[in-house]
Structure formats: C-alpha cells, structure tokens
Regions:
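Extended soluble regions of mature proteins
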Residues: 21-260
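Bacterial N-terminal signal peptides
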Residues: 8-17
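Bacterial N-terminal signal peptides that target proteins for export
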Residues: 1-8
C-alpha cells in the first residue's frame, strides 16, 4: 500500500468513527513536514467544511453535495459532486481490482519470503493495525488523550484526541460516500480496512494533535500538526464563499472525474 493509500485509508476510518455533531468550530494547526512548517486552518459548520493553507484549500458543501479544490499557486479550482466522487471511487476500485488480479498472478510464482513482503506492501500491514492508549496532556487549552496507531512497521501515527470538542456536522448523512471508499477494502490491496475502522473506534473524541512516521520502499517521512487555536461559535458564510476565495481563477476538471 502506498503512502497515499495509507493516508486515504486512515481518513476513511476517521470519518466512519467520527463523533456526533455540535456547534461550529474553527481550528488553527501548526504543521511540520517534508515541505517545511506552516499553518493550516479548519472551519467546520453544520453543512460545510473548509480546510487548507495559503497554497491549497478544500471546501466541502454537504448540503449541495459537492467538493471544491482550490490551488492558489496556480490560481485554479475544480469542483466535483458527491455522485461524481462515488463514481470515481468505483472506477478507481475497478482499476485496483484489475491491477490486483495481475499482481496476484505474478506473486504466485514468487518465493514465499518475497511474496509475503509484497502482500504487506499491497495492504497486508493494515490487518496488523493496533491502537494503544497513552497518557493525557494539554493542547490549545484542552485536555486530550494520547493514542498510538501502528500499521505494522510501515506507519506509526501518534494522536491526541479530546472529548470536549465535537464535529458540528452529522457524518451519518454522508456514510454512503465513505462507504464507497471503504468498499475498496474488499480488494486484496486494501485488505484489513475493516480491522482499521474497528481499531480506530478506540480513539474517543476529536483529534487536535498528531504526528505520522512512514517507511516505504526504503524511504521515510515525518509530518505533524498541533492545534494552536480553537474557537467555538458561528462561522461567517463568507468563509465558505468559493467565488470570493477564487477571484479570477480558472476552473479545471477535477482529477477524479478522469477516472474511467
């Protein structure tokens, strides 16, 4: 499983394990990673979400059923509906099925040790996922519980979650979309997704700090984020105004719509 697939799997699992809805939230994170440090702001309302930094942003409008991706550097943006997203995920799953079948045929002729290593790369590590509870600490004025999520030896994610905060949207309305992504768990390349979802249910509350360490194909990467400001209360509609966020920007096709 590639780094992107791993992170996507964690994202899906996070949505499926999301807490109940509450009032609007604005969270500012300090981040570190391969591209250097920075600041990312997340806006959560009952029907919209906006996340991103000075370079890239994403606006999700659950009421309208669409997602807008904004590239401030290129001055471009793209839109995709939930229906198109679901179709794209299904198309991606079909391609993964095809690639997996070909890989399985090739693996059948490999020595056992090499075959085992390939299976781990194709997602077997997800079935070895574990969540361990740690101590508590303070982040941005909130007490949070430390957890360590380990996916074999390929990825370790340390998270600190607080039960004092909740997402304002009701994710149960959008489980069909999450289900489309999770459906790829039926493919051998994503086996163990169910195990991941179950393990992540042990993480109680909203994550306000995390760090990720990944090792893949002889390479390693480190990234982290920690909330430095958390505000509760109504968010102005202007914060989600795509027109205002993309002045003079060019609209381009969303990459997922090209998956056929």
């Amino acid at each position: 499983m590639t780094n992107t697939r791993m992170l996507a799997a964690v994202a899906v699992a996070s949505v499926l394990a999301a807490p109940a809805f509450a009032e609007d939230l604005t969270i500012v994170f300090k981040t570190t990673g391969g591209g250097g440090g920075g600041t990312v702001t997340h806006y959560f309302s009952s029907d919209k979400v906006r996340t991103g930094d000075a370079d890239n942003e994403t606006v999700m409008d659950y009421a309208a059923g669409k997602i807008v991706s904004i590239d401030h550097k290129k001055k471009e943006y793209s839109e995709i509906t939930f229906a198109e997203m679901e179709a794209g995920l299904k198309a991606a799953a079909a391609k993964v099925d095809e690639a997996s079948a070909q890989m399985q045929q090739q693996m059948a002729t490999m020595p056992p040790a090499m075959r085992e290593k390939m299976e781990q790369m194709m997602g077997g590590a997800a079935s070895a996922v574990t969540v361990t509870k740690g101590g508590t600490r303070q982040v941005a004025g909130y007490t949070c519980q430390d957890y360590t999520l380990a996916m074999g030896q390929a990825m370790t994610m340390k998270m600190c979650a607080t039960t004092a905060l909740q997402y304002p949207m009701d994710y149960r309305k959008f489980q069909a979309l999450a289900g489309s992504a999770a459906a790829m768990a039926n493919n051998p390349m994503f086996k163990g997704m169910g195990k991941m979802v179950e393990e992540m249910k042990k993480i109680e509350g909203l994550t306000i700090a995390d760090s990720t360490s990944m090792k893949m194909m002889g390479r390693s990467s480190e990234s982290s984020r920690e909330a430095v400001e958390i505000k509760k209360g109504p968010i102005p509609a202007a914060a989600f105004d795509v027109t205002a966020l993309t002045p003079g920007y060019k609209k381009v096709p969303h990459p997922i719509t090209k998956l056929k």
